[in-house]
Amino acid sequence: MTKRVILGHPFGNANVRQALAAFTEGGILESFVTTLSAEHFRMLSLLPASFRKEVQRRSFPGVSSDRIKSSAGQELMRLVGTRLGRSVPKIRSVTPSVDEVWKSLDLRLASYAAQASGADLSVYAYEDGAFHTFSSPHTFRRIYELPIGYWREMHRLLEEERDLQPEWSSTLKGLADGPEKLERKERELQMADAILVPSDFVLSTLPQEFARKGTVVPYGCPEVSVGAPRSFSPGNKPLKVLFCGSLGQRKGLSYLFESVARLGSQVELTVVGTPVELCRPLEVGLSKVKWISSLPHAELLALMRQHDVFVFPTLFEGRALVVLEALSQGLPVITTPNSGTTDVVLHGRTGYVIPIRSVDGIEMALEELAKDRELLRHMSDEALKLASETSWLSYRVKLLNAMQNFEFIKQINQ
């Protein structure tokens, strides 16, 4: 039985924070191995205001500071280099990459795991940050979270997309990983004792040798803000449509732009996100809509409440957190099965589930909501209701249960 957990992640995304909260609440968190932690940053007041906010976002309230094992140097260099590289391109060549940060984190996690090893220890690692840790000869359970679908399946789908939409091919960065990185991904899955995934979609992409070690623990929705102002467009005004995410073709952007163009004055599209890489069709598409490159999280949630519907026609995900956020703000969602959210985006109730690459599907769903504002309001109410039932608390409970059922999973797979 797991009595101690060491968790390793360089950035502390929303799902990571919830896993930390679960292990803390369960009294089993041994340590959290990370890069930058505001709790350990001594020069915060000396930083420029914008950079200070970036560091403050790397705060982990609720986790005792002595359990946080941070090493900020490389990640600080990456953040500074990324900012300066916009105006001084030469700096990019000496700026650590995200992949290098992951590798360093993995090596540090392996060291902490070796020091604390024992039959009651589980090490909780993530894709791209587990290879060295899981290769260790020391005794501990190797728990692996795969937050997005299996890489071979993603490559298959994105290679298809490259052929279908060649003008968007430069934005398909998922095809850029080299053979060494892909081999590490494969070995991580092979060495894992148990694999946790956030959706049935992710599990469905895994080959049987990995899927039999898999357990679905769905990420939850943010807390629903009771009484938060929510506006709807009048029936004689265009439907306000929102997209938020990285701006590349993996998110199905070309299909969204085409469907909105077909609908003309019936809809108004707002796009929030940073381009993966600019290409001509993306520039043209953004020129025809309202584009916001980035927003603080609280402002994004407020923006959601000012729109009527959220569209996320992604080709490949794990479990799209932005969809869960949209539901929590009362937005019906139009998305694909590959978003990993079909348990909460219920077709005809809280939104529409359409096939990938379906311009017709997006168009028909938007047109129905534009013409039937009562249906829109009903779906909004249902979205809030379902979001409140699919909380992060339920995720934390399920995660702790999965950790304690590890021995059962192992016996099945032997």
PLM feature segments, named:
Residues R78-S97, F140-E183:
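Acceptor-binding helix/loop patch of EC 2.4 sugar-transfer enzymes
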